[in-house]
Amino acid sequence: MIQEAIYQVINKQDLDLDKTIQVMEEIMEGRATNAQIGSFLTAMRMKGETIDEITACATVMRQKCKRIHPEKDVLDIVGTGGDEANTFNISTVSSFVVSAGGVPVAKHGGRSVSSKCGSADLLEALGINIALSAEQSAEILQKIGMCFMFAPTYHASMKYAAPVRKELSVRTIFNILGPLANPAGANMQLLGVYDENLVEPLARVLLNLGVKRAMVVHGHDGLDEVTLCNTTTICEVSNGNINSFFLSPEQLGFSRCLLKELVGGDPKKNASIALDILNGSKGPKRDIVVLNSALCLYMSYNQITLRDCVKMAEQLIDSGAAKAQLNKFIELSNSFNQEVK
């Protein structure tokens, strides 16, 4: 099937849902060669992935992954990566703020692929044990309202595509799929994308996948976050509907900054930035965490304005609640002796 699909995609023909599912199953079950996987990913990138194709691939990834089953609705804050901006880990730091505000966050990520420091790299540098089983992560989520699910632990079937993806070293559909395959079945999501042309399509994919509330965002400066440097395009999924709008920093009382003011570095550097923010340091790095956290809080609470959510995020940092959440996570994650290889 994958050979037939490669021919079709090379000729700029879209795949239907069923055929894409079959191809993705071949890849995830180790029935496709590295050459076939590389050809398929490259051809799909050049053609451009459709909503049906992305939905099909995400559906297979969700079916193949190890799952945890939260008792409550959970949220994921995640970016596709690939924006080449080398900012610090904005969404990961925001996770501590949002979960401190009573919104369960099931963060899903891995090590660096397109940046100097992935979410897993940052959390390790902060002293968090990421080598946990699904059961252990579920227990932490239940106790403190936050967990981190290290992607390789949950997506064993990705081992067939991972080497090809690393060798290609370009954006592929897998940059898009990771954020769509949360093992906790997160039904609320702030999803940042590297290309404005992906904003509405991925909102429709999330709708297809049954997500309850989501915002797909792209900064006009190229960031896969809600940005402080420019306007952000946002596509909101709510109650089965999709609504698109633009958001500028000024609308929520923020001053714009330069992109270079948001740049991070290696895990040690980004851990230092994260601690500075959680310890109350002011400036653009804090502001962009507050901004992204506010949108997550807004999705999670009814009858509250975005400006109110900005104030809430600021209070969660200034009161020490977000830092306390980090400390709880460090303590609980290191209380387990079992390691997942």
From Swiss-Prot:
Cofactor: binding comment: Binds 2 magnesium ions per monomer.
Which Pfam families does the entry mention? Answer: Glycos_trans_3N, Glycos_transf_3
Check the record and name the HAMAP family matching this protein.
TrpD
What Gene3D superfamilies has UniProt attached to this entry?
A: Nucleoside phosphorylase/phosphoribosyltransferase catalytic domain, Transferase, Pyrimidine Nucleoside Phosphorylase, Chain C
Binding-site list for anthranilate 2: R165
Binding-site positions, anthranilate 1: G79
List positions binding 5-phospho-alpha-D-ribose 1-diphosphate: 79, 82-83, 87, 89-92, 107-115, 119
Gene Ontology process terms (BP): L-tryptophan biosynthetic process
The UniProt entry, under InterPro entries, shows: Anthranilate_Pribosyl_Tfrase, Glycosyl_Trfase_fam3, Glycosyl_Trfase_fam3_N_dom, Glycosyl_Trfase_fam3_N_dom_sf, Nuc_phospho_transferase
Q: Name one GO molecular function term.
A: anthranilate phosphoribosyltransferase activity
Could you tell me what this protein does?
Answer: Catalyzes the transfer of the phosphoribosyl group of 5-phosphorylribose-1-pyrophosphate (PRPP) to anthranilate to yield N-(5'-phosphoribosyl)-anthranilate (PRA).
Q: Where does Mg(2+) 1 bind?
A: S91, E225
Question: Is-annotated flag, keyword Glycosyltransferase?
Answer: yes
The protein's name: Anthranilate phosphoribosyltransferase
| Entry binding sites for Mg(2+) 2 | D224, E225
How it assembles, according to the record, is: Homodimer.
Protein source organism? Ruminiclostridium cellulolyticum (strain ATCC 35319 / DSM 5812 / JCM 6584 / H10) (Clostridium cellulolyticum)
Q: What is its EC number?
A: 2.4.2.18
Task: Keyword check for Magnesium, yes or no.
Answer: yes
Pathway(s) this gene product operates in, as recorded in its UniProt entry? Amino-acid biosynthesis; L-tryptophan biosynthesis; L-tryptophan from chorismate: step 2/5
GO CC annotations on file:
cytosol
**Cofactor list:** Mg(2+)
Q: Which domain of life is it from?
A: Bacteria
Reactions catalysed, semicolon-separated, are: N-(5-phospho-beta-D-ribosyl)anthranilate + diphosphate = 5-phospho-alpha-D-ribose 1-diphosphate + anthranilate
